[in-house]
Amino acid sequence: MKISVKTLKGSTFQIEVDSAQKVADVKRIIETTQGQHIYPAEQQMLIHQGKVLKDDTTLDENKVLENSFLVIMLRQGKGSSSSAPATSKAPSNQAPPTQTVPAAPASQAPVAPATTVPVTVSAPTPTATASPAPAVAVSSEADNYGQATSNLVAGSNLEATIQSILEMGGGIWDRDIVLHALSAAFNNPERAVEYLYSGVPEQMDIPVPPPSIQPANPTQASQATQPAAPSILSSGPNASPLDLFPQALPNASTDAAGLGNLDALRNNAQFRTLLSLVQANPQILQPLLQELGKQNPQILQLIQENQAEFLHLINEPAEGDDEENLLDQFPEAMPQTIAVTPEENEAILRLEAMGFDRALVLDVFFACNKDEQLAANYLLDHMNEFDDEGPP
């Protein structure tokens, strides 16, 4: 019999199966027909009428009939985040080289298996070139692009993803719960579905202090008062803290406490950069405030005591006649050279492979505290602005 298989992005394909076949066999059929690099059987999760199908059960036992449809998603395997094309690694019998990568080189440099790799963040000159590097196959760049974009949705695709997840649940979830899971997963549909089945990690499920006045922006109000779904697990792919606040901010908190308001924070370039990210993507406000409470409770207390001024900071436009993006201030606030690990350098290359300028990628990557998914989400959400106005 023929059944349809839907993806979270809305695409559909058909496969020929037998009702007596086990779910594990169906996964292998999908792997064979669609490609092992796209849908590896061991990472597949098949869902029918809101139920995750077990490998040792048959289609008949799960009431999968002719012309039924399954929803497919991929589990985030341990090796998926660290995987990289073999051509990008140096031979193991050579001494680990150290490289300095310009902010916008003419060609990619190899990823070295050293513990840290210095990356120059300062603005490049048009003639800047990288040290000679072995050519990377075109197919590996395509793989990098797929890895960076396949798990994120934004813009018009977001509504289609919400509807797809609602259909997947077969009515067991309402829209608010799905939106909450997507918010906690930073618009990663696969991770959001995992949260719906296993619970949103405690680190991502926090209340925001209730404002004492009506916010100027209704969107900000809806984000601040969004109801929390039941939290079950304290572990998961997004369980690690976001550490969105750099080391320069503790001094700012001391100055701000002396003033009794947010003037010191208003003039802090890094804090202004974080505010610009919140303005662009209000969904990060909750985890940002949570991490602020962990790393600098004095600033969080100051924000709670000056909620009206904080809301004004969030809603006010960027300063300057040309309304320059606040990310322009980030290179001035950070050291000119920052050491990154090989894994972080691979993340930078994957973001570059999406077609963005390297200087822009570095600015956003470090502004998002080296969170690859958050940086990719920001770049995708604002790609039209970058095309029209150039990099910030």
Swiss-Prot record:
Residues 214-231 have a biased composition (Low complexity). Residues 260-303 form the STI1 domain. GO terms for cellular component: cytosol; nucleoplasm. Disulfide bonds: none annotated. One of its GO terms (biological process) is proteasome-mediated ubiquitin-dependent protein catabolic process. Residues 156-199, 342-382 form the UBA domain. One of its GO terms (molecular function) is polyubiquitin modification-dependent protein binding. Residues 80-109, 209-237 are annotated as: Disordered. Keywords: DNA damage, DNA repair, Nucleus, Repeat. The keyword DNA damage applies. SMART domains: STI1, UBA, UBQ. It is found in: Nucleus. Its main location: nucleus. May be involved in nucleotide excision repair. Binds and presumably selects ubiquitin-conjugates for destruction. Prefers multiubiquitin chains rather than single ubiquitins, with a binding affinity for 'Lys-48'-linked ubiquitin chains. Acts as a ubiquitin receptor that associates with the 26S proteasomal docking subunit RPN10 for the indirect recognition of ubiquitinated substrates of ubiquitin/26S proteasome-mediated proteolysis (UPP). Interacts with 'Lys-48'-linked polyubiquitin chains. Interacts with RPN10. Interacts with VP1. This is Probable ubiquitin receptor RAD23. It comes from Oryza sativa subsp. japonica (Rice). The gene is RAD23.
